Regions:
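Active-site diphosphate/adenylate-binding microenvironment
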Residues: 3-14, 171-236
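Short acidic, glycine/proline-enriched helix-loop-strand junctions
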Residues: 28-43
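Active-site nucleophile and cofactor-binding loops and adjacent substrate-binding regions
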Residues: 20-24, 41-51, 67-73, 205, ...
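Structural signature of the thiamine diphosphate
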Residues: 7-10, 17-18, 123-172, 304
Length: 304
């Protein structure tokens, strides 16, 4: 097991003091500590996180730490290969990757697929990596950091599920929603009560899809035309928009704030088409709830 505070202290002793990334349930006990630091930036997607880290290095000539789930590694490939690669600008980066679907670990189907190919993907990208499972593996991290700084290339730490110690009680996640807010499951219940029977619902990853399925099953709502986005975070609106190209379908996208932020450009495409059979409902709880509850500063953004 890894003590999250010891990990953070170790990285800072190695002069890694800037952190950015996208929340992950495997890393939540580590990233919950990061959320208390001024030198931490929550990115909208993994490619942006890598790009922020690259910019930090260009400005300060110091190695940044970029965290993500392995399912988001694909989002990061473009800047990793097109900017940070040793054949381009040669930028040292430390990637900390939550390894969902690691071999021998029971997980959801979408994670098993990515988990199986994660090591090979890193090898294909030319990124040296190590699997970190306990505090005494910090020497592996040290070697990776030294190698990255010497060769000026990205390196990665793979961390399996149930590896990082829980944070202490004083650091437990907070509820960022006011007492006047409504619960997500109540929003979903009202949607089910008010849509027509043939309406197709496309629900985003995480608790939204789980609770929609739960409501259908437990509260005896009529079986619907639902598509649950168990993976592909940030793409629910585009999938729903694609479904709406069949004009006979009434389509509702049930999205979350963290998901929508990942690929905001999709809203421009969808909005320009002005389709009458497409509705986009955003459930804004100002946090990445299903992967650790990290706060999203969406309260300052006008969504209307």
């Amino acid at each position: 097991m890894i003590n999250s505070k010891k990990l953070l202290n170790f990285l800072e002793k190695k002069d890694v003091k800037f952190y950015t990334g996208v929340p992950d349930s495997v890393l939540k006990n580590f990233t919950n500590l990061l959320s208390q630091k001024n030198s931490h930036i929550l990115a909208s997607n993994e490619g942006s996180a890598v790009s922020i880290g690259i910019g930090y290095y260009l400005a300060n000539k110091k190695m940044p730490c970029i965290y993500m789930q392995n399912s988001g590694l694909a989002n990061a490939i473009n800047p990793l290969v097109s900017i940070a690669h040793k054949g381009v600008y040669s930028i040292p980066l430390l990637l900390i990757i939550g390894w969902r679907g690691s071999p021998g670990f029971k997980d959801e189907p979408q994670h098993l697929i990515k988990g199986k190919i994660t090591k090979n993907l890193l090898k294909l990208l030319g990124i040296r990596f190590a699997v970190i499972q306990r505090d005494r593996d910090f020497n592996k991290i040290s070697k990776l950091i030294n190698y990255s700084k010497t060769k000026k290339i990205p390196v990665a730490c793979l961390i399996k599920n149930n590896t990082i110690f829980p944070v202490s009680k004083k650091n437990k996640k907070k509820n960022f929603i006011s007492k006047d807010s409504i619960l997500r499951i109540d929003v979903l219940r009202e949607v089910l009560k008010n849509i027509k029977s043939k309406t197709k619902l496309i629900s985003t990853t995480g608790y939204t899809s789980r609770e929609l399925y739960q409501l259908r099953k437990e509260e005896k709502f009529k079986k619907g035309k639902d598509f649950y986005m168990i993976g592909g975070m940030g793409h629910s609106s585009s999938v729903a928009f694609g479904v709406s190209t069949n004009k006979s379908n009434q389509v509702v996208c049930l999205d979350g704030d963290g998901s929508m932020l990942m690929h905001l450009g999709s809203l421009h495409t969808i909005g320009n088409m002005n389709k009458n059979n497409f509705k986009h409902i955003l459930i804004n709880n100002q946090s990445h709830e299903s992967v650790g509850g990290q706060k999203i500063n969406f309260i300052r953004t006008n969504l209307e």
